[in-house]
Amino acid sequence: MYKLLVALHLILCTVSHVKTRQRWTALTPEETLFIYTRCQEEHLPADNNSRKTYIENWHQWKLQPNDHVTQCYTKCVLEGLELYDGKQKKFRPGRVSSQHVAYQFLNGATADEVAKYKGAIDALEPASDSCEDLYMAYFPVHETFVNVTRKLYHGTVEGAARVYNSDPNLKRKNESLFTYCEKHVYGDQNREDMCRGRRYELTGSDELRNMIECVFRGLRYIKHGDINIDEIVRDFDHINRGDLEPRVRTILSDCRGIQPYDYYSCLINSDIREEFKLAFDYRDVRSADYAYIVKGNTYDAQKVIAEMNKVEKHVCG
C-alpha cells in the first residue's frame, strides 16, 4: 500500500498541468510541449503547402506570416501558457517570474532579461482579446524577447535536456502516457493485473485505479478536478466517430461516482465500449508524440491495432 501511495504522489506531481491546483505552478517541458503542439494541431490549415510554411516558421519561433491563422495560434499559446487570462482579459506578468524561479538554475536565462521580459508584458494593453489585437500587442515583445521565451518555456535543446536529466519522474518524449503510468504505478509488480488492465478488464485493484487516474490526468480528461468531457469527445472525433458525441456526454453525465476509474468503468460498460477502446488506443499512440497529427498522420484503425498488439506482446508476452 505504501508503494501505491508513493506512486500516486509521483503521478500527481509529474503530470502537473492537469491536477487540481490551489495555486499556479511552473510548467514542465511535457506541459509546454503539449500546449504548443495542441495549438498547432488546432490552428494549422488543412492545405499541405501552406501548412508546411506555418510549421517551419512556428517551430523556429517565428510568429509568421501575420495572418488570422498565426494570430489565433499566438492567442492559443498565450492562454495555454497562462501568460494571458482570457476570462479576465489581461496579461499575467507574474507567471514569467514563477516560471523562471522554478527553473532558474537549468534554463540559462538571466534575472535581468527575465525582468525586462516581464516588464514588457506588464505594459501590454491590447485593444481587445481578439486574435488580431492580442497578436498585434504581443508580437513586438515576442520579437525582442524570443530567446528569453525559449529559455523559460523549455524551447532550447540544452535547457530542456537539463530539466529532463534533473527529474526522472517526468514523462519522456517518445514515451506513451500509458507506458509512463504503468512504470510509475506498477513498476515490476503485479504484472498480471497490469496486463488485464491493458486488455480493458476492470479488475478494481488499487493499482489499476491509480493507473487510470494517472492516464486520465495526463490525457487532460480531468480539468480543474472535474471530468473534461470535451477532451474525451475530441478523441472520438479523431477516430471519425464524432456522431457519438451525444451518447458520450450522456454516459459520462449519468455516470455515478467521482473518480477517473468510475468514468472509465462507465465507458467500458456502455454500448460504445468498442468505439471507446479504439479512441483510447489511438490516443495512446499519439501520446508518445504530441506532434503526431501536426506531422500529417491520420487515423488508421489497423495501424493502431497493430501497434497496440505489438506493445502488449512486448510488455505482457
Swiss-Prot record:
Keyword Protease: no
CDD domains reported in the protein's UniProt record: PBP_GOBP
Protein location: Secreted
GO BP annotation list: sensory perception of smell
GO MF, any single term: toxin activity
Function: Modulates blood feeding of female mosquitoes on vertebrate species by binding and sequestering different mediators involved in the host response, such as biogenic amines and eicosanoids. Binds serotonin with high affinity. Binds tryptamine, octopamine, dopamine and noradrenaline with low affinity. Binds leukotriene C4, leukotriene D4, leukotriene E4 and U-46619, a stable analog of thromboxane A2. Does not bind leukotriene B4, adrenaline, histamine and ADP. Inhibits platelet aggregation induced by low concentrations of collagen and arachidonic acid but not by ADP or adrenaline.
Protein name from the UniProt record: Long form salivary protein D7L2
Annotated gene: D7L2
